[in-house]
Amino acid sequence: LQEPIAGQIRVFDQGMVGKEEDEATDVRRRWGVLFQGGALFSTLTVAENIQVPLREFYPEFSKDLLDEIARYKIFLSGLPPEAAHKYPSELSGGMRKRASLARALAMDPELLFLDEPTSGLDPIGAANFDNLTRDLKETLGLTVFLITHDLDTLYAICDRVAVLADQKVIAIGAIEELLAIDHPWINAYFSGPRGRAARRGHSDQNDKVRAEMQQRGRS
């Protein structure tokens, strides 16, 4: 939506700055976006929202095919089948997030952008959304690029983290690598009370998973 004033943006090894619109559109077909507020069209049902990008890029698709795709994306996002005919105003906050995710998955993207995916969700809903994102990443082979301030989300699903501070990227790496960096902002963020709590929770969860796997191995 905005042209950068400096630097380059490369996606799928293609420069996006100054790219011809037709060429840029071909690249955009390969990614999906979940906006922070959902950005669902209020006058369309969940199924119709999911079909919006499909109608734009594939006008030759029949109604039956569009409906079938919408049903499948609703299933992938963890929504009940009856959500297809509901309007955004009839959904809870967590369901709206999932409906927005279903739309982001409509084009079978290789790359999924998530903008603050757990904002506005209670701790249980946020954890469930993290688990869903991780499952989709592993099942569909997605590359997920997300913006978040949620430490639990970082620990739950992120392989690499880019830290933005002082109007620039100050570090990139796995969380364990970032913890070894002596920078005041990084120390305050990852080693403050919330950071320590998230790290303990992640460690406890890993211990639980290992114990369950060992138990299965003995049974």
Question: What are these language model-derived features?
Answer:
Residues 15, 63-82:
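Conserved ABC ATPase "signature" region
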Residues 44-53:
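Short coil-to-helix segment of the ABC ATPase nucleotide-binding domain corresponding to the Q-loop/switch region
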Residues 87-91, 95:
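Conserved ABC ATPase signature
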Residues 108:
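Conserved catalytic motifs of ABC-family nucleotide-binding domains
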Residues 112-115:
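Catalytic Walker B motif of ABC-type/P-loop ATPase nucleotide-binding domains
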Residues 154-156:
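A short, surface-exposed alpha-helical micro-motif characterized by mixed small hydrophobic
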